[in-house]
Amino acid sequence: MNLVGSYAHHHHHHHPHPAHPMLHEPFLFGPASRCHQERPYFQSWLLSPADAAPDFPAGGPPPAAAAAATAYGPDARPGQSPGRLEALGGRLGRRKGSGPKKERRRTESINSAFAELRECIPNVPADTKLSKIKTLRLATSYIAYLMDVLAKDAQSGDPEAFKAELKKADGGRESKRKRELQQHEGFPPALGPVEKRIKGRTGWPQQVWALELNQ
C-alpha cells in the first residue's frame, strides 16, 4: 500500500479545500520553454568580460573608440573636428616658434649695447676681450674717476672746470650789443623801466596821450 497515495486520498476526502489561486499562476508552474528563453539573459549577465566579448581585449575600448581617440588626440573634445584641431596645433606651433626669435633679438640688442659701452672706456687695447661683468666693472670705475676729477676741479676754483649752465646770461646778446653801440657813439645809457614810464611815452596814440596830460 502506498502511504503517500493513501494519505493524499484521505486528506482530499475528509478535508476538501478550494484550490489556492497561486497554484494556477503561470510563473510557478509554467512550461519549461520559458526557462529556456530567460536563460540566455542570465548567462550573459553572469559571464565575465573576456567570455562576453571575445573579439575585444579585456578592459580595452572598442576599435571605433580607439580609432576616434587616435584621430582626434588625447585633448580633443567631442564637438571638435580634425580640421579645427589642426588649426589649433598650427597656432600653437607658431607661438612656440616666435619665442626663440624674441630671445635672439634681445640677446643681439644686449650685445650691441655692451659693445658701445666698451668703446667708451679709454686705454683698453683693441684686441682685449672683455666679458659683460668686466665691462660693467670698468665702466663703474671710469665713472667714479670722472666724478673725482670734477670734484677736484670744483674745489680748486679752476674756471675751466665743467659746469652745467642752464640759465642764460642777463640781457642776452642783443642787450650787450646795444650797450656797446651807445658807449661808442657817446649816448647816455638807456633809462631804467621806472624812468621810461615817467618821461617817455607809452604805445598809445598821440591824441589819447594828450587827453591824459590835460586831465
UniProtKB/Swiss-Prot annotation:
GO function terms (MF aspect): bHLH transcription factor binding; DNA-binding transcription activator activity, RNA polymerase II-specific; DNA-binding transcription factor activity, RNA polymerase II-specific; DNA-binding transcription repressor activity, RNA polymerase II-specific; enzyme binding; identical protein binding; protein homodimerization activity; RNA polymerase II cis-regulatory region sequence-specific DNA binding
Biased composition (Basic residues): 92-104
Ranges annotated as spanning the membrane: none
Gene Ontology annotations for the cellular component aspect, listed alphabetically: chromatin; cytoplasm; nucleolus; nucleoplasm; nucleus; RNA polymerase II transcription regulator complex
Biased composition (Low complexity): 65-89
Keywords, sorted A to Z: Activator, Developmental protein, DNA-binding, Nucleus, Phosphoprotein, Transcription, Transcription regulation
Region of interest (Disordered), residue spans: 53-109, 166-198
Keyword Transmembrane tagged: no
Biological process terms in GO annotation: angiogenesis; blastocyst development; cardiac left ventricle formation; cardiac right ventricle formation; cardiac septum morphogenesis; cartilage morphogenesis; embryonic heart tube development; embryonic heart tube formation
Modified residues (Phosphothreonine): T107
Domain of life from the UniProt record: Eukaryota
Maturation and modification: Phosphorylation by PLK4 disrupts the interaction with MDFIC and leads to translocation into the nucleoplasm, allowing dimerization and transcription factor activity.
Residue stretches making up the bHLH domain: 94-146
Described purpose of this protein according to its UniProt entry: Transcription factor that plays an essential role in both trophoblast giant cell differentiation and in cardiac morphogenesis. Binds the DNA sequence 5'-NRTCTG-3' (non-canonical E-box). Acts as a transcriptional repressor of SOX15. In the adult, could be required for ongoing expression of cardiac-specific genes.
Record's subunit section: Efficient DNA binding requires dimerization with another bHLH protein. Forms homodimers and heterodimers with TCF3 gene products E12 and E47, HAND2 and HEY1, HEY2 and HEYL (hairy-related transcription factors). Interacts with MDFIC. Interacts with SOX15; the interaction enhances HAND1-induced differentiation of trophoblast giant cells.
Record-given protein name: Heart- and neural crest derivatives-expressed protein 1
Gene label: HAND1
